[in-house]
Structures are given as C-alpha cells and as structure tokens.
C-alpha cells in the first residue's frame, strides 16, 4: 500500500524522462481536444524505469479508468475478449505488461480490436461452430516490454506511438528519493539522497528499494535525520560499492580477472565457473557491467576492461586489453 501512496499521479509529479513527458503532453492534449482516445502506445526499456507508473499517470491525466494485466495472463482469445468486452468503457486504457509474451493466438485477435474495435469469437466446434462479432468500446492499449525485439512486426505496426524509457541520472534518482521521503515524513539530506541515487543502477525502482532499506538502518539506530554518513554505512552494509555493484557483480569480475586472466571467456564457461545460470548472467548482471564500462562482449567472449581491474584494486594487464 505504501508504494501505491507514493506513486505519482500527474506528469509534473513523475520524475525524469523529460523528453518523453514533453511529447506525451502534446499527445494527451491533442487527444482531449479531439475528444478521442489516445492512440495505442508501446513503452519499452529495461525493467524498473516506471512503465507501469507512467500508464497510471496517463490514465489519471485523461480522467479514464486503467485495466492492468500482463501478456502471460492472457492465454487464449477468450481471456482477451473478457477483458475488452467486460472491463473497459469508452476511452479507458488497457495496460498489458510483458506484451511480448502474448500467445500468438491472443495476439492475432488483438489486431482487429486495436484497429476497428471489434473482436470475432468462434463459438462451438466443427460444423456447428459459429462466429460472434463483439463490438468493443474505443479504448487505448498501452503495451510495455523489456524485449522490444520480440514484438512481432504486425503488432508493432498497430501502435501509433512507440517510446523508449531511458535510464535515470543520479540527480533524478535523488529527486525521487527526496519525494518519497517527504511523502513518508522521513528527514533525509540531499547528499544522502544523492549517494542512494548513485548506487541505484539508473533505475527508479532500485532507488526506492534502497531508500527503504537505508531508512530501516537509520530508524534502528535511532537517528531522526538520514545523513550522508548514515546512508553510506547502510549502503555498505547492503553490500553496495560506490558504483552500485552488488557482491555478485564483483564476483563475476573477479572470476573473469583471476581465473581467466581478464578474458576473453565464453558465457557458458563463465557461468559454470560462477555456478550461475547463463541467462541470469546475460540478462541480469551483464547489462549494468557493460553500461558502466567494466565488461565487454566480444566475438571471442567476455573481457574485463581496465576500469574493472582498477575498480577491484588489481593491476591492469600489460599492453592493450583485447578488443572486439
């Protein structure tokens, strides 16, 4: 319930994503002026950047209802029909998270719903089967995905607006922490909020989670104000360093450097050495390490960068590191 109370309701309250918000203000004002539903919108980007929150904000700005579901929850056309025909009114928004995981059958039934606001359902089987056409209210579909490459071309082409959410700066994340603190009645210095922001991997969800944990440490210590020093102590206790690396992130780099001489080493081999699932390594840990300039993917395998050596306190290898 705390998260719901902290969720922004308007674009002005929504922190970050300034370029996207500027465009959304135009789209929303135009739709309201024409008294039409907003065009179907696809939001894509890494997890934790606020796609679901933005859908709630858009619904609030338009003064319409929001129905939230996910791709895996819509297994068959009947599930989709039940939502579209029974849960939505004129102008309402249907938000489908992980829309890339829609079944092919459900996705194909979504096409006419998006284009013409109708849906054909087959009743019965064999010679007795008949088709019933459902007239649907004019609605807006907001799809969200972390894997835009898995969105099929026919589905992608039916979105009138396609937008990418970017990682947040430490300063924007600090603003988010300060906002949550203010709403919760927690006193925190700007310096402490910035230290949390610097370790939040560019992700608002992580910043909010770290703020709650730092608040726990401060509360147990009996401190009325979260200072920079208290925040640093709490973040260190959580195993986070100044780049926001967790223990597992550092283990990946250390194994790469100490056991494989900095690489290159194949993903499967590295995963085996770490007793880790290759998919988890590739999708959860590597993106941030690459974005921080600590790891490179090359045709021959993973390579630790000079920055990785220096960050962990190891002397970098003599000569240039292997390049792709």
Swiss-Prot record:
EC assignment: 3.6.4.-
Temperature curve summary: Optimum temperature is 70 degrees Celsius, ATP, ATP-gamma-S or ADP are required for thermostability.
Residues engaged in binding DNA: 297, 302
Sample GO molecular function, one term: four-way junction helicase activity
Keyword terms of this UniProt record: ATP-binding, Cytoplasm, DNA damage, DNA recombination, DNA repair, DNA-binding, Hydrolase, Nucleotide-binding
GO cellular component, one term: cytoplasm
Cofactor(s), names only, from the UniProt record: Mg(2+)
Keyword Cytoplasm included in the entry's annotation: yes
UniProt-listed CDD domains: AAA (cd00009)
GO BP term, pick one: DNA repair
Catalytic reaction(s) noted: ATP + H2O = ADP + phosphate + H(+)
PANTHER family the record matches: HOLLIDAY JUNCTION BRANCH MIGRATION COMPLEX SUBUNIT RUVB, PTHR42848
The protein's name in its UniProt record: Holliday junction branch migration complex subunit RuvB
UniProt source species: Thermus thermophilus (strain ATCC 27634 / DSM 579 / HB8)
């Amino acid at each position: 319930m705390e998260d719901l109370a902290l969720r922004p309701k308007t674009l002005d309250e929504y922190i970050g994503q300034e370029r996207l918000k500027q465009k959304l203000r135009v789209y929303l004002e135009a739709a309201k002026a024409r008294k039409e539903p907003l065009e179907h919108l696809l939001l894509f980007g890494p997890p934790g950047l606020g796609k679901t929150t933005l859908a709630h904000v858009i619904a609030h700005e338009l003064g319409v209802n929001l129905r939230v579901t996910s791709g895996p929850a819509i297994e068959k056309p009947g599930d989709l029909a039940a939502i579209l025909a029974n849960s939505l009114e004129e102008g309402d928004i249907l938000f489908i998270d992980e829309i890339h995981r829609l079944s092919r059958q459900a996705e194909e039934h979504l096409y006419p719903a998006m284009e013409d606001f109708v849906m054909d359902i087959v009743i019965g089987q064999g010679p007795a089967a008949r088709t019933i056409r459902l007239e649907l209210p004019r609605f807006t579909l907001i799809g969200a995905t972390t894997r835009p490459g898995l969105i099929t071309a026919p589905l992608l082409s039916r979105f009138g607006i396609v937008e990418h959410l970017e990682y947040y700066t430490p300063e924007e994340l600090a603003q988010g922490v300060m906002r949550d603190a203010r709403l919760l009645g927690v006193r925190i210095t700007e310096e402490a909020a910035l230290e949390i922001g610097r370790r939040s991997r560019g992700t608002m969800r992580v910043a909010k989670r770290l703020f709650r944990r730092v608040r726990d440490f401060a509360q147990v210590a009996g401190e009325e104000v979260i200072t920079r020093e208290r925040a640093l102590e709490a973040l260190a206790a959580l195993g986070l360093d100044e780049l926001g690396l967790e223990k597992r992130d550092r283990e990946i780099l250390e194994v790469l450097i100490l056991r494989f001489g900095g690489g290159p080493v194949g993903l499967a081999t590295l995963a085996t050495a770490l007793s880790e699932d290759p998919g988890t390594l590739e999708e959860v840990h590597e993106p941030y390490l690459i974005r921080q300039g600590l790891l490179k993917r090359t045709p021959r395998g993973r390579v630790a960068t000079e920055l990785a050596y220096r960050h962990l306190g190891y002397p970098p290898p003599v000569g240039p590191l292997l390049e792709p």
